[in-house]
């Protein structure tokens, strides 16, 4: 035997290992439809069974971490769809399958078609978020594409009536189950887009089996939803049901009732928000008015402080105080002189210088007379100055000017009217007189020739 021939000789272990590696590398995972037989579940929790058809069979194992995700318990004689890897059990040389997932045969084929269509449409970009249209807020009119006799329509209408009774609803009745259902759903979507009555559409139905919901896994329905110019909310089955329509739609709702919640406004909450905003507006208005009232009060106080009558009264009070002080000072001086005179008289009486006393007495009387005259002149001077000051204040007082026959006229904007350029025919003026106000309206404006100014004629 040559050296090359010797190197190609296998042991049984090496042969089984090589075959196992070849099967696992070349075959990978496969989908297999078959009938279950010899099903068993030992204490380990693993499943062991045989998959067969009418001409062959193969052993299969499904370990506990995989069979835990299966939604049914397999039965002998049941047709199933299995996704499995091919391997070889080296100790016995038996090739077998290691199952990863299992479904009843009918559902399994549909699920396989679902996955294939999902991958195809995803590759084309139909599920991309960039194609999703935003829902209108709020919706002005809602369209519902579903069965006219189904529970889904009743649920949608009930929620819309409860949340937003004023929201108009248009129903596009269609079959949602059966061979003709996909085409009818497509036509309903196209009709809604053609009529353009609604600004959002709810497309869906109530719950059911995978076969019942299969119309919403149809490629034609998916493309119709994608091509719709009106935003579409899918609402197919229950929350656990997922269809191709859910991936293509602009928004997926777990149930038809949830879809109605998404497209409608909660009128009670809206009223509550409006009431809250109204209350905040009233509080802001009250605060604004209070601020303006305080500002007006301060301005009124300042104006009152600057009024000519008040200023004149303050000056008059000051002059009266000065007059009282002057009179008190004069009286004090007179009392002092009188006391001094009395003391002098007492001293003179003691020495009895009659002639000197007579002369001093005359001098005192003269000084007293001159003092009284000086005090009187000074008081008259103060009175005269006080009268002049009062006259001057009265002369500059606006009320005195009005009393002499003058008036003050204001424009509609509140400005003083100084020139005819400030007014025009039809304007209303307010004129302040000594004893009140006069409202007048300009009927004609004439420009004087000498001064080139307008003459205002009012009525």
Swiss-Prot record:
Q: Which domain of life is it from?
A: Bacteria
Q: Which InterPro entries match?
A: Exonuc_VII_L, Exonuc_VII_lsu_C, OB-fold_nuc-bd_dom
Q: Which UniProt keywords apply?
A: Cytoplasm, Exonuclease, Hydrolase, Nuclease
Q: Where in the cell is it found?
A: Cytoplasm
Share an example GO biological-process annotation for this protein: DNA catabolic process
UniProt KW Cytoplasm keyword: yes
Pfam families named in the record: Exonuc_VII_L, tRNA_anti_2
The entry assigns this protein to a family as follows: Belongs to the XseA family.
Complex formation: Heterooligomer composed of large and small subunits.
Q: What is this protein called?
A: Exodeoxyribonuclease 7 large subunit
**Native species of this protein?**
Yersinia pestis
């Amino acid at each position: 035997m040559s050296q090359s021939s010797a190197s190609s000789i296998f042991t049984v272990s090496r042969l089984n290992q090589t075959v196992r590696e070849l099967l696992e590398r070349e075959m990978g995972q496969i989908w297999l439809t078959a009938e279950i037989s010899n099903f068993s579940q030992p204490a380990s929790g693993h499943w062991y069974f045989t998959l067969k058809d009418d001409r062959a069979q193969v052993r299969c194992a499904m370990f506990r971490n995989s069979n835990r995700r299966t939604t049914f318990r397999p039965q002998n004689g049941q047709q199933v769809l299995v996704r499995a890897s091919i391997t070889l059990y080296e100790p016995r040389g038996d090739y077998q399958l290691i199952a990863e997932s299992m479904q009843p045969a009918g559902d399994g084929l549909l699920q396989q078609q679902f996955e294939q269509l999902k991958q195809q449409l995803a590759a084309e970009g139909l599920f991309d978020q960039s194609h999703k249209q935003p829902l209108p807020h709020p919706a002005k009119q809602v369209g519902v594409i579903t069965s006219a006799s189904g529970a889904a329509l009743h649920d949608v209408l009930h929620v819309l009536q409860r949340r937003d009774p004023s929201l108009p609803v248009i129903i596009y009745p269609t079959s949602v189950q059966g061979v003709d259902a996909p085409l009818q759903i497509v036509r309903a979507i196209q009709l809604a887009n053609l009529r353009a009555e609604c600004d959002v559409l709810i497309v869906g139905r109530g719950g059911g089996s995978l076969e019942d919901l299969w119309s919403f896994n149809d490629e034609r329905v998916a493309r119709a939803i994608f091509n719709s110019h009106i935003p579409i909310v899918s609402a197919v089955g229950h929350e656990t049901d997922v269809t191709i329509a859910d991936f293509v739609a602009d928004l997926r709702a777990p149930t038809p009732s949830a879809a109605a919640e998404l497209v409608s406004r909660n009128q009670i909450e809206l009223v509550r928000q409006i009431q809250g905003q109204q209350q905040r507006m009233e509080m802001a208005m009250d605060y604004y008015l209070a601020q303006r009232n305080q500002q007006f009060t301060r301005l009124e106080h300042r104006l009152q402080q600057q009024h000519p009558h008040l200023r004149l009264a303050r000056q008059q009070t000051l002059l009266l105080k000065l007059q009282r002080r002057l009179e008190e000072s004069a009286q004090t001086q007179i009392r002092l002189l009188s006391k001094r005179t009395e003391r002098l008289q007492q001293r003179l009486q003691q020495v009895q210088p009659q002639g000197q006393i007579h002369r001093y007495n005359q001098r005192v009387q003269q000084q007293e007379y001159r003092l009284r005259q000086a005090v009187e002149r000074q008081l008259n001077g103060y009175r005269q100055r006080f009268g002049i000051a009062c006259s001057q204040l009265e002369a500059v007082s606006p009320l005195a000017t009005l009393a002499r026959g003058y008036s003050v006229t204001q424009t509609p904007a509140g400005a003083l009217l100084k020139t005819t350029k400030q007014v025009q025919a039809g304007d209303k003026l307010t004129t302040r007189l000594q004893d009140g106000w006069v409202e007048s309206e300009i009927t004609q404006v004439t420009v004087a020739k000498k001064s080139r100014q307008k003459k205002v004629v009012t009525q």
